[in-house]
Amino acid sequence: MLQVNHERVAKLLQGLAAFTDSEEGVTRLAYSPLDKKAQSWLLEQVQNLHLQIRTDAVGNVFLRRDGKQPQLPPVASGSHLDTVIHGGAYDGMCGVVGALEAL
């Protein structure tokens, strides 16, 4: 059964929430320098997971971990790090961090 590391999840969520342009909520617009910094920070945090990392032409990041049974189809999860202006602290980030925790 999956064991959630609450400290790791909190660290990632708090760390990502710090990349904001506003004091109210979280503002990290897509493709902004702050968005790119948040993405780089997150990739630094997951280096020890030994994932295959690929970025496409528009900046989407794909993290892959090979399964123990390669004949089975892959499981995929998608989310985003950017936010709307004054967005919620967990908008998008929860999906990213949740998927990482499942790995």
Question: What do the predicted segments below correspond to?
Answer:
Residues K11, G15, W41-Q45, G98-E101:
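Alpha-helical scaffold segments in soluble metabolic enzymes
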Residues E23, P73-H86:
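Glycine/charged-rich beta-loop-alpha catalytic/anionic-binding loops adjacent to active sites
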Residues Q3-P33:
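N-terminal capping segment at the start of a domain
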Residues V9-L13, P70-S77:
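Short coil-to-beta-strand
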Residues S77, G87-L103:
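Alpha-helical metal-binding/catalytic segments enriched in His/Glu/Asp
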Residues Q3, R28-A30, H80-T83, A89:
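Residue-level preference for alpha-helix termini and adjacent loops
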Residues Q69, V84, D91:
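Glycine-/small-residue-rich active-site loops that bind phosphorylated ligands and cofactors
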Residues S22-D66:
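A non-catalytic alpha/beta surface segment that caps or lines the substrate-entry region
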